């Protein structure tokens, strides 16, 4: 199939994996995520990648450069420009479900990380080569 066509809200709400790549193009990538209560992605920076986040369920705290904080809820979006240190923390009572668009792509096509531990292990292996 060329591109991605689907109900992204339903796909996001159905997803229970920490990270799942739905589509990878030459210049952008669509990813769904699910963070457990209290879970966070960890402070990170992508020097060459812009990110768009859309919250579909739950509440999240976005922290930029370890000081600027924004609490967002279902239906809200956040843009994280390349070069911005950021963290996303699930501050709600249940699962945080979101989708994000990376531009350019950030993960290998078809990536599925069932848990944060799986994602951390894959990152470690990727950076050790």
Where is each model-derived feature located?
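Ligand-binding loop in jelly-roll beta-barrel domains
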Residues: 82-108
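Short, conserved beta-strand element in jelly-roll/cupin
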Residues: 34-36, 45-62
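A generic "binding-loop/recognition-motif" signal
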Residues: 28, 37, 48, 68, ...
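Short, charged/polar surface micro-motifs in flexible loops or helix N-caps
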Residues: 26-28, 37-40, 57-61, 104-108
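A short, N-terminal "cap"/entry segment at the start of jelly-roll beta-barrel domains
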Residues: 1-29, 42, 111-129
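Short histidine-centered beta-strand/loop micro-motifs
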Residues: 20-23, 33, 41-46, 64, ...
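Short acidic-glycine-tyrosine-enriched beta hairpin
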Residues: 66-82
């Amino acid at each position: 199939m060329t591109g991605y066509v689907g109900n992204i809200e339903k796909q996001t709400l159905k997803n229970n994996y920490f990270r799942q790549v739905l589509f990878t193009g030459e210049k952008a990538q669509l990813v769904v995520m699910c963070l457990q209560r209290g879970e966070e992605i960890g402070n990170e920076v992508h020097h060459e990648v812009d990110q768009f986040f859309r919250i579909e369920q739950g509440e999240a705290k976005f922290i930029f450069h370890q000081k600027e904080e924004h609490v967002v809820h279902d239906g809200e979006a956040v843009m994280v420009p390349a070069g911005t240190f950021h963290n996303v923390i699930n501050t709600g009572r249940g699962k945080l479900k979101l989708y994000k668009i990376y531009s350019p792509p950030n993960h290998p096509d078809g990536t599925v990380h069932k848990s944060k531990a799986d994602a951390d292990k894959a990152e470690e292996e990727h950076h050790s080569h």
